[in-house]
């Protein structure tokens, strides 16, 4: 089993964790409906880049 030889300092721990932060998702307003949606994703109404891509049932 792997066991560390000496204790890691808080500085080293912080350096290791420096890339663990979550980034915010990019939100865009749809040009047709004005609805908020994630970038490169279809809106809840079925629009993508101003075109209807999912038909209503």
Curated annotation (Swiss-Prot):
Composition bias type Basic residues, residue spans: 1-16
Source lineage: Bacteria, Pseudomonadati, Pseudomonadota, Gammaproteobacteria, Thiotrichales
Annotated Gene Ontology cellular component terms: large ribosomal subunit
GO biological process, alphabetically ordered: translation
Homology family: Belongs to the bacterial ribosomal protein bL32 family.
Keyword presence, Plastid: no
Keyword Transferase appears in the UniProt entry: no
Positions with biased composition (Polar residues): 21-31
Start and end residues of each stretch annotated as Disordered: 1-37
MF (Gene Ontology): structural constituent of ribosome
Alphabetically ordered keywords of this record: Ribonucleoprotein, Ribosomal protein
Protein name: Large ribosomal subunit protein bL32
Spans through the membrane: none
Originating species: Hydrogenovibrio crunogenus (strain DSM 25203 / XCL-2)
Pfam families: Ribosomal_L32p
Superkingdom as given in the UniProt entry: Bacteria
């Amino acid at each position: 089993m792997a066991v560390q030889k000496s204790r890691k300092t808080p500085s080293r721990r912080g350096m290791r964790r420096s890339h663990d932060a979550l980034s915010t998702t990019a939100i865009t307003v749809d040009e047709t409906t004005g609805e908020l949606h994630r970038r490169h994703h279809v809106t809840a109404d079925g629009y993508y880049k101003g075109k209807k891509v999912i038909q209503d049932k």
